[in-house]
Amino acid sequence: MNDPRKGADAEPTTHFGYQNVPESQKAKKVAEVFHSVAAKYDLMNDLMSGGIHRLWKRFTIELSGVRSGNRVLDIAGGTGDLTRQFSRLVGPSGEVVLADINASMLKVGRDKLLDKGVSGNVSFVQADAEKLPFPDNHFDCVTIAFGLRNVTHKDEAIRSMLRVLKPGGRLLVLEFSKPSSSLLSKAYDAYSFSLLPLMGKLVTNDAESYRYLAESIRMHPDQETLKAMMVEAGFDRVTYHNMTGGIVALHRGIKP
């Protein structure tokens, strides 16, 4: 968001967690977070969610409608949880592209998938979600899991995803969202701002990255706002499903 107190030539600012920073600095700061946590990313996901993130991702796979021969783009694919399942679904005649802007996360994902024997129909691309380096009307399905909140210009990223989808193609956005009850919200806040940074300190020696995680979730658009953004970008039949009381939401939209 722009700061109206600054002159017309001043660089626009945006949020990095609860901080207000120049737009050009956000990508650098986000990159530093993920360079720091990449090696322990999977372990922390299991610890933070009690393993429930695997159920959230399984539901994403089920709702994707991906089948044999499809071409899938997994944006912010990180350590490859979704890519691994999509690779199995699309088979040898299909293709999965794991894209991530962060080189450290991309390396961890590539190494992990190769160790598990996932190859042949998977490729790895370092890419910015706002400027996807793929042709128009190219993919049957695009997913972004726990990545959109880190993007500086979310509206541009959503339009970029629309562009690379084929007509009738599906976008699925899996992201932390707004809990549906005030009681759950209070408990979630206590966990996020107290236990999460402590866990990050103990496991990765980096409390600040997990403090940013908690703050970035609160700054991310809520369920209805993100739905409206997808409609505004040009998606049809946009719906969302709350999971774990709205702590996580899965949005789905179709390209006309």
UniProtKB/Swiss-Prot annotation:
Enzyme Commission number(s) from the entry: 2.1.1.163, 2.1.1.201
Gene name of this polypeptide: ubiE
Involved pathway(s): Quinol/quinone metabolism; menaquinone biosynthesis; menaquinol from 1,4-dihydroxy-2-naphthoate: step 2/2; Cofactor biosynthesis; ubiquinone biosynthesis
Record-linked HAMAP family: MenG_UbiE_methyltr (MF_01813)
Function: Methyltransferase required for the conversion of demethylmenaquinol (DMKH2) to menaquinol (MKH2) and the conversion of 2-polyprenyl-6-methoxy-1,4-benzoquinol (DDMQH2) to 2-polyprenyl-3-methyl-6-methoxy-1,4-benzoquinol (DMQH2).
Residue positions binding S-adenosyl-L-methionine: 79, 100, 128-129
Cross-referenced SUPFAM superfamilies: S-adenosyl-L-methionine-dependent methyltransferases
Similarity comment text for this entry: Belongs to the class I-like SAM-binding methyltransferase superfamily. MenG/UbiE family.
Keyword match Transferase: yes
GO biological process, one term: aerobic respiration
Catalytic activity annotation: a 2-demethylmenaquinol + S-adenosyl-L-methionine = a menaquinol + S-adenosyl-L-homocysteine + H(+); a 2-methoxy-6-(all-trans-polyprenyl)benzene-1,4-diol + S-adenosyl-L-methionine = a 5-methoxy-2-methyl-3-(all-trans-polyprenyl)benzene-1,4-diol + S-adenosyl-L-homocysteine + H(+)
InterPro entries assigned: SAM-dependent_MTases_sf (IPR029063), UbiE/COQ5_MeTrFase (IPR004033), UbiE/COQ5_MeTrFase_CS (IPR023576)
Pfam families, per database record: Ubie_methyltran
Keyword Oxidoreductase: no
Protein name from the UniProt record: Ubiquinone/menaquinone biosynthesis C-methyltransferase UbiE
Keywords: Menaquinone biosynthesis, Methyltransferase, S-adenosyl-L-methionine, Transferase, Ubiquinone biosynthesis
Organism: Pseudomonas paraeruginosa (strain DSM 24068 / PA7) (Pseudomonas aeruginosa (strain PA7))
GO MF entry, a single one: demethylmenaquinone methyltransferase activity
